[in-house]
Amino acid sequence: MVAFTDKPRFGTLLTAMVTPFTNEGAVDVDAAQSLAAHLVDGGCDGLVVTGTTGETSTLTDDENVIMFKAVKEAVGDRAAVLAGTGTNDTAHSINLSRRAQEEGVDGLLLVTPYYNKPSQAGVKAHFEAIADATDVPIMLYDIPGRTSIPIETNTIKALAEHPRIVALKDAKGNLGETTKVLAATDLDVYSGDDGMTL
């Protein structure tokens, strides 16, 4: 993902990492660390670990934490490490976010609650509860094609008032709405849709 804004907190170019597995189906820590180092050596400013590309919904919480720790150890301070800790369950998201914070991640990527289709008030309450329960900067992830619910522009504007909500990964595919967010907030906005960027 590429930032639309100048001097973004997490860097300009972030890569959503895959989660490598062994032939036995376990998380492959060595491969994850090798991949993370390779991506940073190749110019990535930040890595998203166990986001939706990293199969977070198929991992146990312990496997997620293994990945957070492994990637942070591999890259240290050479790149920002964001942990994909968003789920469709607020309490679960808070717990996983706190565990990511304990591993020293630089930020959290929180996808919109999927499947349940909450109202915009529910979306806002979900994200605010996680932000209130942690001390880590947060990037919201708006990908309605996968979650079935957008984060509407007015909801994003309201969430941008929270001191820990600092960025948006926008995969909505609507540059008009992206422009409104850029004009109305101080959020760092990243493109979550390569076709819209390139």
In which residue ranges do the predicted regions lie?
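Short amphipathic alpha-helical surface micro-motifs
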Residues: M1-V2, Y190
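Catalytic alpha/beta core domains of metabolic enzymes, predominantly
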Residues: D132-A133, P144-L198
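Active-site beta->alpha loop and helix N-cap motifs at the rims of alpha/beta catalytic domains
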Residues: V2-T15, T19-S148, I156
